[in-house]
Amino acid sequence: THKHIDHLTGIIDHLTGIIWMIRVICQNMNSGKYEGEVTIYGHAEVISLLHNLAEQLLPKKQTRFIGDRLHLICVSDAETRTINDRNVTFFDIGSTKAKQFGFSMELSSGKKLVYCGDEPYNDCEKPYAKGCEWLLHEAFCLYSERDLFNPYEKHHSTVKDACELAQKLHVPNLVLYHTEDKNIQNRKELYSAEGESYFSGNLYIPNDLESIEIV
């Protein structure tokens, strides 16, 4: 989605970033453990950076697969691609920090799943997000704990903010992610309790590796 270091390289105790994924995939291609191809989509700044970092950080026995079996594909604002038999439209979220894309995916039912990126929703996303079936939106912390975590200073929102947004956009299913983890054992319960006061649809706060069926 964008070039912030925690997403490109991965940081300790967080989900590993895209550079680490490229390394592992190419490593397994080289050893014969990874069959087939893989395609990574991103805007021009991200794709250029991935090319450069991979060439500088990874050995040639791994980078030789880039452009051959591992494809780094540039996409533009409002561009639609067919991915796994689904029409996916990429869009610029209007970030003031770094160029960043979200996407809208057409589901088999004809309805849409929309991912808003790593920052709070901007009005420029409305043509994609309004009335979608599934909305994926970040929520850094509870609104009741905003003074503790300072989400707005980090260009993030709260559970209350995301839920009010989903209600306003007439979204039936809301998935919250990119949350703090200080009280991870009780996060689902606490976030659900706050969110249900502002959102009447189905609210999901998934744990790591939890699956959600989307149709």
Where are these regions (language model features)?
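Binuclear metal-dependent hydrolase catalytic cores
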Residues: 1-114, 120, 125, 189-215
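Cap/insert and terminal regions of metallo-dependent hydrolase folds
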Residues: 120-210
